[in-house]
């Protein structure tokens, strides 16, 4: 475990130079230790950092652009400098994607389903988050969380995950900010129009939880982070529930939503 802590410290230093493509939460506060039992810390020794969400004992959901070599997945972590007895580490056994082209990760299908090499055990600091059973509603209050940058562009990283609240916004608000964004995608637009709160470098792949439901995966957004009238883009999890459930059930040839 000492090696893990050393790697974590090196990772924080290396991430000082990361771009938002590996999107901490700006404008938030330290998460309550009991509110992120499903949150996975995903990284490798090269310094690439993402988050993920445990959806059952054997599967983690994250962003496709978080794919990396030598990936390690840590569960039950709160403070990177303090070890808990129930922390668990896994590596991917299999990875599943919906991508048809590299451009999909920008505008659509930025989703990766990971089967772990062995099931994790539920504990005081580890428990899965269910998939959504309803689509998100416009204006919903949503929770974001992660170990990413808490300042931008001069990035500072925290050893604990930060949490904050944002809202689901009309899709047109994101189209107005990001030129070339298609008229329809499987993306959620979410943020605070006045700025000051946002996901940022190191948060990619983490959950967007709206009214208690896992509705989005942190995908990408404008950099520097947390600027006014620059909401973030999140993969809409509800649209992929059939695909996810089919893969988990063993139907590895399941079709992604068009």
From Swiss-Prot:
One of its GO terms (cellular component) is extracellular region. It comes from the Eukaryota. Thrombin-like snake venom serine protease that cleaves fibrinogen beta (FGB) releasing fibrinopeptide B. Promotes capillary permeability-increasing activity through the release of peptides from the beta-chain of fibrinogen. This is Thrombin-like enzyme CPI-enzyme 2. Residues 19-24 form a propeptide. Disulfide bonds join 31-163, 50-66, 98-256, 142-210, 174-189, 200-225. Its EC number is 3.4.21.-.
């Amino acid at each position: 475990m000492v090696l893990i802590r050393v790697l974590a410290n090196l990772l924080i230093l290396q991430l000082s130079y990361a771009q938002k493509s590996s999107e901490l939460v700006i404008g938030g506060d330290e998460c309550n230790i009991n509110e992120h039992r499903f949150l996975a810390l995903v990284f490798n020794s090269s310094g690439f950092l993402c988050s993920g969400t445990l959806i059952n004992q054997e599967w983690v959901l994250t962003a496709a652009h978080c794919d990396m070599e030598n990936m390690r997945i840590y569960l039950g972590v709160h403070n990177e400098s303090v070890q808990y007895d129930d922390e668990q580490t896994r590596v991917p056994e299999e990875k599943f994607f919906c991508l048809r082209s590299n451009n999909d990760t920008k505008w659509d299908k930025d989703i990766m389903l990971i089967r772990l090499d062995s099931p994790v055990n539920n504990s005081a600091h580890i428990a899965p988050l269910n998939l959504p059973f309803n689509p998100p509603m416009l204006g919903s209050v949503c929770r974001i969380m992660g170990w990413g940058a808490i300042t931008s562009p001069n990035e500072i990283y925290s050893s604990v995950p930060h949490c904050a609240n944002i809202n689901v916004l009309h899709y047109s608000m994101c189209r107005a900010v990001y030129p070339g964004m298609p008229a329809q995608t499987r993306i959620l637009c979410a943020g605070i129009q006045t700025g000051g709160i946002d996901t940022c470098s190191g948060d990619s792949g983490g959950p967007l939880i709206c009214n208690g439901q896992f509705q989005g995966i942190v995908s990408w957004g404008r950099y520097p982070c947390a600027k006014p009238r620059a909401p973030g883009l999140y993969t809409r999890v509800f649209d992929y529930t059939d695909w996810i459930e089919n893969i988990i059930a063993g139907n590895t040839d399941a079709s992604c939503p068009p």
